[in-house]
């Protein structure tokens, strides 16, 4: 089984992905973990590699290529990243998009990173705008198009302990034999 969990910063991807992976006996592969691996391979910290990525688009492409390769070549994976659903493409059994209003996500990020909510909100907005442009330019992906996702959950509506339960019920009920069709992923340029 290949599950993907995607969403913007602060939506609860990692928390939810950890729980889902444990429940379904899947290996949790995080885009953040792969980014840290890329940094280590280059003898850099994640912060240093992130700074380089601002000037060198090949760093993003290397990360995305590695995530796509994992999605296509490995079994029993939960792939978690902003683009996981897009990168896994039709190899994914279930694609999940988690989201929450910006003010809620900024509050979560502020708590996690020990900064003010206003700072977290402005940084998040700037980051999201930058990433949306890059994804469109690199791969022709409109990150605001959620039509490819099988499940979309506003994580602000339920306690964080309940969100995985909601998804677990839907995923456990999934029967590939009775699947009448997922939304295809079309016109994406996997140019790494």
Curated annotation (Swiss-Prot):
The keyword DNA repair does not apply. Its main location: cytoplasm. GO terms for biological process: pyrimidine nucleotide metabolic process. Keywords: ATP-binding, Cytoplasm, Kinase, Nucleotide-binding, Transferase. It catalyses: CMP + ATP = CDP + ADP; dCMP + ATP = dCDP + ADP. It comes from the Archaea. This is Cytidylate kinase. The gene is cmk.
